[in-house]
């Protein structure tokens, strides 16, 4: 998919306005669907949003970034907090927030021997140092299956 051409098509179809700058894929984006750069007008998009969520959701992400783009160049409020932005986003049916990834990001699972409270962590914890926050019972690491 030629990203800049796709963004130009979405801009004309959904906004009735041309997109005059470039759009790029940015693999370094982790928690966001895209970014608008007011300094030079280009847009960055997260390729995983297209892979994980499909073209329908990705089109809504493109609309979101184009709201920033068009409002900025019209001299209107282009930030998330601005009424102009919220109104235009609702008008074109863009996404306000990016859908969360279905992939689990927790690597370590612990449970309390006494009360059964479950803890999920990205980083390993020292079981001789930490105890359950509920009952101060001993924690054990659960096996991943």
From Swiss-Prot:
Pfam families: SprT-like. Zn(2+) binds at residues 64, 68. Coiled coil: none annotated. The keyword Transcription regulation does not apply. Binds 1 zinc ion. One of its GO terms (cellular component) is cytoplasm. InterPro entries: SprT-like_domain, Uncharacterised_SprT-like. It is found in: Cytoplasm. The active site is at residue 65. GO terms for molecular function: zinc ion binding. It comes from the Bacteria. Keywords: Cytoplasm, Metal-binding, Zinc. Its cofactor is Zn(2+). Residues 4-140 form the SprT-like domain. GO terms for biological process: response to stress. Belongs to the SprT family. This is Protein SprT-like. It comes from Streptococcus pyogenes serotype M18 (strain MGAS8232).
């Amino acid at each position: 998919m030629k990203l800049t051409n796709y963004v130009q098509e979405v801009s004309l179809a959904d906004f009735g306005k041309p997109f005059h700058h470039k759009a790029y894929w940015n693999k370094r984006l982790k928690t966001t669907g895209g970014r608008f750069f007011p300094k030079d007008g280009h847009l960055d998009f997260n390729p995983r949003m297209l892979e994980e969520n499909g073209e329908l959701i990705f089109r809504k992400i493109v609309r979101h970034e184009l709201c920033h783009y068009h409002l900025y160049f019209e001299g209107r409020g282009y930030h998330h907090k601005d009424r102009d932005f919220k109104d235009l986003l609702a008008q074109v049916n863009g996404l306000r927030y990016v859908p969360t990834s279905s992939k689990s990001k927790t690597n370590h699972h612990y449970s309390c021997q006494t009360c059964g409270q479950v803890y999920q962590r990205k980083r390993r914890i020292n079981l001789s140092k930490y105890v359950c926050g509920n009952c101060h019972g001993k924690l054990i690491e659960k096996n991943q299956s």
